[in-house]
A protein has these predicted regions:
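Active-site core of glycosidic bond-cleaving carbohydrate-active enzymes
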Residues: 1-134, 138
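Non-catalytic C-terminal accessory modules of carbohydrate-active enzymes
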Residues: 88-209
Length: 209
């Protein structure tokens, strides 16, 4: 690849351009320089300087109003906060989207125009708040769980490696999880300071308590 490496600029944020230009519109709704955080995986907790710079980039964008112009840009913010493991902030933008950008039938609208990417992006963000698997060989459960969701359950969430996750949690703590391997394979499951090494045959499952 001939793409230049990700750089941190003078503001402590990720550079949007090859040169560290002064931003003309610091609150713009497009945030393609954060692609490495979401939906890709070049920026994770394993790259702490970039992880911190990504968070600062988002904070700066939001300070100048970048997020609320469209449903899809709001959905992008939800996913960013999920990847940063900031559940309260993610939930705040879910609520903002529901209050200001959805029609009564839950379609994401820009004026009278239906923009389905807002709906797809927001639901993807909710899933990311509950299960993440973008890091090689790791599945994280409840990585960005907000206080308002402190008790609940989900079934059938998919993870990389062709795993399927069903789980219950109570008072903010994992109660039970079942990991089903559709194809067979290994992975590590991480949740709230605990780790499990999983090695399953095709069609087999393992319950974590």
């Amino acid at each position: 690849s001939k793409l230049p490496p990700i750089k941190i600029g003078k503001n402590g944020t990720l550079q949007e351009w090859y040169e560290d230009y002064e931003e003309v519109e610091p609150g713009h709704r497009h945030m393609s320089h954060l692609y490495a955080l979401y939906p890709s995986n070049q920026i994770t907790q394993a790259t702490p300087e970039l992880f911190k710079a990504a968070e600062k980039t988002i904070e700066r964008r939001l300070t100048y109003g970048g997020a609320g112009q469209t449903g899809w840009s709001r959905a992008w913010i939800i996913n960013f906060f999920a990847r940063l493991q900031k559940g309260e902030e993610g939930l705040e933008h879910i609520h903002e989207m529901m209050a200001t950008q959805l029609s009564p039938n839950m379609f994401d609208l820009l004026g009278e125009i239906f923009q389905i990417e807002g709906n797809f992006g927001a639901t993807a963000g909710i899933a990311e708040m509950l299960v993440q698997s973008h890091e090689e060989g790791i599945i994280r459960l409840l990585p960005a769980l907000p206080e308002a969701w402190n008790t609940g359950k989900v079934k059938g969430l998919k993870a990389r490696g062709n795993f399927e996750i069903s789980m219950e949690w109570e008072a903010g703590k994992l109660k039970k999880a079942e990991i089903l391997s559709i194809s067979g394979g290994k992975t590590k499951v991480v949740c709230q300071g605990k780790e499990w090494e999983i090695n399953l045959e095709k069609g087999a499952s393992q319950v974590l308590l």
